């Protein structure tokens, strides 16, 4: 199968994991009424995903490094299977929860494959673009979930919504199951150990993990609490559109920024700009909160914040090599999902005061800015697995 067709199928599957993750998030009120559970329980249908990721990230990454075809195939089957399982009882909380657990178990196997797919099927000059495309697919899935949930629910209830999403997941899974039968065009070094011991003393990877902790944490906190924060200023009704604007900006940023910074070897500069913008944006929003201004500010934030993920993943693959790419991404996304849980809880603790809530987001960005100074200015500064700072072909 052509490498771009493989990437397209993988992107569809990766987007499907986000689509299924956030199925119930935009329609929490309707879900709790239809299923006869509390709004908190309805919210748990999405909340289990980051917790499952924290538990499964490292073993999933190690399995991908050792048996890529089997591991990614399992992720595809679990994603499609979970989507179908929810159709057993569209209005049943029990079936919904069971399906979400199955999808959540498959998600790390899919998302940890982003750099592995790029390394196996793409030549070195195209890998940054392939990693960017894989990352963009995640944001497209998030946006699709946010924008389609309400209309599909109103058009045909939960059954129509779940059927459409299951169909997307099944097609994507079938595509990937065919794609993984294609032999790797670029093999790794079989002598490299897939043990996780190397992570313990790899300071570079810990710094990248800290930055993803901040970045994904900020995004999750904004997505969770923006409505409540702006509600204190009388503008809560605009939160859904503002989050969509932030996500669209991120799709644009992730599509163009990683290749540009990789070509100029300016990865650290981009990450420093990202956390710097985070500090400024939320500090300024606390003082200026007209909807138009907030939209512009969040567009700028989304453009750099969501573009930072493929930059970090690309840098990690360059640093570790393709043999350990699954474990590396698993470790980084574990940190990111943990950040999502922690920062959501931190903001929740001060949610009664919008200034403290926005200040917490700015402080998180400031911590990331300090952390970013520990990165080398350029890849050739000695962090890369290849001494030249260039990818092995």
Regions found by a protein language model. Give the residues of each.
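A late C-terminal transmembrane helix in Major Facilitator Superfamily
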Residues: 317-353, 361
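C-terminal transmembrane helical hairpin of 12-TM major facilitator-type secondary transporters
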Residues: 267-312
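Extracytoplasmic gate region of multi-pass secondary transporters
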Residues: 24-25, 204-254
């Amino acid at each position: 199968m052509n490498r771009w067709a493989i990437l397209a199928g993988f992107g569809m599957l990766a987007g499907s994991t986000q689509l299924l993750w956030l199925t119930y998030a935009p329609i929490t009120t309707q879900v709790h009424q239809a299923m006869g559970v509390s709004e908190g329980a309805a919210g748990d249908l999405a909340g289990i995903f980051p917790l499952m990721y924290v538990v499964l990230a490292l073993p999933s990454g190690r399995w991908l490094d050792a048996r890529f075809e089997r591991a990614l195939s399992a992720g595809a089957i679990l994603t499609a299977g979970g989507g179908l399982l929810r159709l057993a009882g569209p209005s049943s909380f029990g079936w919904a929860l069971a399906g979400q657990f199955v999808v959540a178990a498959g998600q790390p196997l899919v998302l940890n494959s982003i750099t592995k797919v790029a390394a196996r099927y793409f030549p070195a000059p195209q890998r940054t673009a392939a990693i960017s495309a894989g990352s963009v697919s995640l944001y497209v899935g998030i946006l699709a979930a946010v924008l389609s949930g309400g209309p599909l629910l109103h058009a045909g209830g939960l059954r129509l919504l779940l059927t459409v999403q299951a169909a997307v997941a099944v097609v994507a899974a079938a595509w990937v199951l065919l794609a993984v039968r294609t032999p790797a065009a670029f093999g790794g070094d079989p002598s490299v150990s897939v043990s996780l011991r190397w992570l313990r003393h790899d300071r570079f990877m810990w710094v990248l993990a800290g930055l993803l902790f901040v970045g994904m944490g900020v995004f999750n906190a904004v997505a969770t609490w923006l409505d409540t924060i702006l509600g204190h200023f009388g503008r809560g009704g605009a939160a859904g559109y503002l989050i969509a604007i932030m996500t669209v900006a991120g799709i644009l940023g992730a599509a163009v920024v990683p290749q540009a910074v990789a070509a100029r070897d300016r990865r650290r500069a981009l990450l420093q700009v990202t956390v710097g913008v985070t500090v400024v944006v939320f500090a300024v929003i606390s003082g200026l909160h007209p909807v138009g201004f907030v939209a512009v500010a969040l567009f700028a934030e989304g453009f750099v914040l969501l573009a930072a993920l493929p930059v970090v993943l690309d840098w990690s693959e360059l640093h570790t090599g393709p043999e350990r790419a699954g474990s590396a991404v698993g470790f980084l996304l574990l940190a990111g999902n943990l950040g999502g849980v922690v920062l959501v809880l931190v903001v929740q603790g001060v949610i009664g005061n919008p200034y403290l809530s926005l200040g917490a987001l700015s402080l998180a960005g400031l911590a990331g800015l300090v952390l970013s100074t520990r990165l080398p200015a350029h890849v050739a500064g000695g962090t890369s697995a290849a001494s030249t700072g260039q990818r092995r072909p």
